[in-house]
Amino acid sequence: MLKVVTFMKQVATGLQVEGNFGTAHVYRSSLNAIIAYCGKADFTFEEVSPEWLKGFEIHLRSRGCSWNTVSTYLRTFRAVYNRAVDLGKAPYVPHLFRSVYTGTRTDHKRALCDEDMKKVFAKLSRTSGVPFAVCQAQELFILMFSLRGMPFVDLAYLRKSDLRDNVITYRRRKTGRPLSVTLTPEAMILVKKYMNRDPSSPYLFPLLKSREGTKEAYREYQLALRSFNQQLMLLGELLGLSDKLSSYTARHTWATTAYYCEIHPGIISEAMGHSSITVTETYLKPFRSKKIDDANKQVLDFVKRSIVGVSAWK
């Protein structure tokens, strides 16, 4: 019968050959977690049961994995299992993954509060000894926010041909959805400041050098992302932010700011290129309770003003 570890390695290799290096990386990380849990070099799909999966979930949590990481590993393994079933190489077990967590949690708030936003968008003084790399990270963060919370991966892979006049047109790498963003004058200033000066490079920004779709380009992207997040962490410490600053923060902050501006979640979803409005709602969920509380306070304040002097309610 088909062996799990062997099959997952084959799937990961196939993904890499197709140029899906990020997905291949997730599959290998999931596989390493599975090997650490089962303690065997390989095993068959027949050995996988609801109890086995629950044990894997408990094992991951005991290692300090977040619920979202647990979900990623389990969903990855479920995809591998389904592929094996489709090939007739693994037995179909109804509701095999029913007892384990495969959802998405929003326990951790990634968006900036108003006070932190003011700090991040304020101009840094180079005379105060702030490193150039930190200033650059701040301005790229502001640019990503200005481009409707563009993910760093999409920024890195933007091509010069994607920019026409003051409009950037591109496809989201995660969902493949086409997006068109009109640049504000402020965003255009930042684009011109950091755009690639190498005439032989197809990329709009000098974050990558190798040809798109190659393993080298993926490695360059990973290094650029790691460096960007390191500089953002330093920026957050320098500004005394209440929450950690990362590449994700620009995207989540744009979504929640739009939400507080009374923009419909459907429009926010379209603007961000989400695969569905459900993804957008995951971004907004942590802030709905506060917005509902604010709405309740507005109602109560209105009632208080209306009945002042005629009610025992004080």
Residue ranges, per PLM feature:
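N-terminal core-binding DNA-recognition domain of tyrosine recombinases/integrases
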Residues: 9-22, 31-108, 123-127
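Basic, Lys/Arg- and aromatic-enriched nucleic-acid-binding interface segment
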Residues: 94-152
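Conserved tyrosine-mediated DNA breakage-rejoining catalytic core shared by Y-recombinases
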Residues: 98, 147, 157-193
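Catalytic-site neighborhood detector that most strongly recognizes the C-terminal catalytic loop/helix
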Residues: 111, 172-176, 272-297
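Active-site/catalytic core of tyrosine-dependent DNA strand-transfer enzymes
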Residues: 117-118, 184-242
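Short, basic (Lys/Arg/His-rich) helix/loop patches that form interaction surfaces
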Residues: 129-132, 229-270
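Short, polar N-cap/turn motifs at the start of nucleic acid-interacting alpha helices
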Residues: 161-167, 242-243, 263-282, 310, ...
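C-terminal secondary-structure termini that scaffold catalytic or DNA-interacting sites
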Residues: 199, 207-215, 298-314
